[in-house]
Curated annotation (Swiss-Prot):
<dbReference type="InterPro" id="IPR004364">
    <property type="entry name" value="Aa-tRNA-synt_II"/>
</dbReference>
<dbReference type="GO" id="GO:0005737">
    <property type="term" value="C:cytoplasm"/>
</dbReference>
<dbReference type="GO" id="GO:0003676">
    <property type="term" value="F:nucleic acid binding"/>
</dbReference>
<dbReference type="GO" id="GO:0005524">
    <property type="term" value="F:ATP binding"/>
</dbReference>
<keyword id="KW-0436">Ligase</keyword>
<protein>
    <recommendedName>
        <fullName>Asparagine--tRNA ligase</fullName>
        <ecNumber>6.1.1.22</ecNumber>
    </recommendedName>
</protein>
<comment type="similarity">
    <text>Belongs to the class-II aminoacyl-tRNA synthetase family.</text>
</comment>
<keyword id="KW-0547">Nucleotide-binding</keyword>
<keyword id="KW-0067">ATP-binding</keyword>
<dbReference type="GO" id="GO:0004816">
    <property type="term" value="F:asparagine-tRNA ligase activity"/>
</dbReference>
<keyword id="KW-0648">Protein biosynthesis</keyword>
<dbReference type="InterPro" id="IPR004365">
    <property type="entry name" value="NA-bd_OB_tRNA"/>
</dbReference>
<dbReference type="InterPro" id="IPR004522">
    <property type="entry name" value="Asn-tRNA-ligase"/>
</dbReference>
<dbReference type="Pfam" id="PF00152">
    <property type="entry name" value="tRNA-synt_2"/>
</dbReference>
<dbReference type="InterPro" id="IPR045864">
    <property type="entry name" value="aa-tRNA-synth_II/BPL/LPL"/>
</dbReference>
<dbReference type="Pfam" id="PF01336">
    <property type="entry name" value="tRNA_anti-codon"/>
</dbReference>
<keyword id="KW-0030">Aminoacyl-tRNA synthetase</keyword>
Length: 467
């Protein structure tokens, strides 16, 4: 076979030098035709679009042609030709074909459609489908957008540890890391495990957030962001929860809650705009195949300012809805941690645009959030989105050493684990703010997928750690 430099299909579709010899490589999506001519849809993953390879059967070995089945991997040399078919600008008239890899007839991805549940069982193969090819290309582009946004704004990308001895959220739902023999654990007289001989000499876990360490960096570098994996050992089998997911967490010195809200709104609009501008084919495919309102919803986020509303006002709106006959599964009252149905009512039914809810009761928020003058609420903010509910959670951080100490004691957090965090309030404290965005929740919104397990390559959920 003549050696010709490979052209990615995404680039081939932009070429207009018809008559040129080209090489394309990829996997067979479909093969159809007559006794004289076959049409092979070839895809290499660079785009949602296939290239049509036209094969004059008289010019090729019959035994080789038998190997060209759905899923087979081919290298094709041929002439780039202007296509007469609808929906494609160019096709390749095959001159030489090499089968790089045959595909066994047990290949589970055939032309017929497959359920999402089935595709999760074969997560190692599902990136080959149109749907997951689109999702994972968008995932890549969203990661690029995140780094680009923060770099352009002068933030520093800061790497926080995956293994930690602190519980940022105070929830205690952490995966433990140990080298100890689980069948022969050393315990003290109270029956508590002794970690002196463990690898780190203390109890260690996988991180639930890089925020606390991010705050340390922000009080030195000014503006930082983290972007990495986080872990929650919650036994939650829902379409919105994963045990392993990715988080983006900016922290900014001297920003108060207002600037924090401004940053969150600007950031998420940037990401949505990036998806529309740079993933148009993939977004359109997902809009047409899964969620007919996807593009309209994405464009809607960009059109208007987000509503900014105190938690107390949000509760009043929800209580008025109940009084008028609206039924929620979970009760509404001041002090409740809002459920997704409450958040979505505010966004989808009442305001019909994204909402930033602020000033939450301190009892339902984390210890590090700055307390308001009323003593009841904290300067927290949650960004609520249509279809998703909460997509961003953040706050202005408590910068007063004594108030932070008091809050840590109130929540019975061991002081021995917090000395390093308190040092930032002891040595040149400053106002600072930040937030966390669950990457997969952003992807749920941008792709229109309905289950968070379908926007991460290999989902980690209770009783599932395959691949």
């Amino acid at each position: 076979m003549e050696k010709i430099s490979r052209t990615k299909i995404v680039d081939l579709m932009k070429r207009e030098d018809f008559g040129a010899m080209v090489n394309v490589k990829g996997w067979v999506r479909t093969r159809r035709g007559s006794k004289q001519v076959n049409f092979i849809a070839l895809n290499d993953g660079s785009t949602i679009n296939n290239v049509q390879v036209v094969v004059d059967l008289a010019n090729f070995d019959e035994e080789m042609l038998k190997q060209i089945t759905t899923g087979a991997c081919l290298s094709v040399n041929g002439v780039l030709t202007e296509s007469v078919g609808a929906g494609q600008k160019a096709e390749v008239q095959a001159r030489e074909i090499e089968v790089l890899g045959t595909c066994d007839n047990t290949y589970p991805l055939q032309k017929k459609g497959h359920s999402m549940e089935f595709l999760r069982e074969i997560a190692h193969l599902r990136p080959r489908t149109n749907t997951f090819g689109a999702v994972f290309r968008i995932r890549h582009n969203m990661a690029i957008a995140i780094h680009k946004f923060f770099h352009e704004k002068g933030f520093f990308y800061f790497h926080t540890p995956i293994i930690t001895a602190s519980d940022c959220e105070g929830a205690g739902q952490m995966f433990q890391v140990t080298t100890m023999n689980l069948y022969d654990l050393k315990k003290d007289e109270n029956g508590s495990i002794v970690y002196d001989d463990d690898f780190f000499g203390k109890q260690a876990s996988l991180t639930v957030s890089g925020q606390l360490e991010g705050e340390l960096a922000a009080t030195a570098l000014g503006a930082i962001y983290t972007f990495g994996p986080t872990f929650r050992a919650e036994n939650s089998n829902t379409p919105r929860h994963l045990a392993e997911f990715w988080m983006i967490e900016p922290e900014v010195a001297f920003n108060e809650i207002q600037e924090n809200m401004d940053l969150a709104e600007e950031f998420i609009k940037y990401c949505v705009r990036w998806a529309l501008d740079n993933c148009a084919d993939d977004v359109k495919f997902l809009n047409d195949m899964f969620d007919k309102g996807l593009i309209e919803r994405l464009e809607g986020v960009l059109k208007e300012d987000f509503v900014r509303l105190p938690y107390t006002e949000g509760i009043k709106i929800l209580e008025e809805a109940v009084a008028k006959g609206h039924k929620f599964e979970f009760p509404v009252y001041w002090g409740v941690d809002l459920a997704s149905e409450h958040e979505r009512y505010l966004v989808e039914d009442h305001f019909k645009r994204p909402v930033i809810l602020t000033d939450y009761p301190k009892e339902i928020k984390a210890f590090y959030m700055k307390q308001n003058e009323d003593g009841k609420t904290v300067r927290a903010m949650d960004v609520l989105f249509p279809k998703i509910g909460e997509i961003i959670g953040g706050s202005e951080r408590e910068s007063d050493y004594n108030k932070l100490m008091m809050r840590i004691e109130e929540m019975h957090i061991p002081m021995k684990d917090m000395w390093w965090y308190l040092d930032t309030r002891k040595f040149g404290t400053c106002p600072h703010s930040g937030f966390g965005l669950g990457f997969e929740r952003l992807l749920l919104f941008v792709t229109g997928m309905s289950n968070i397990r379908d926007v991460i390559p290999f989902p980690r959920t209770p009783r599932n750690a395959d691949f």
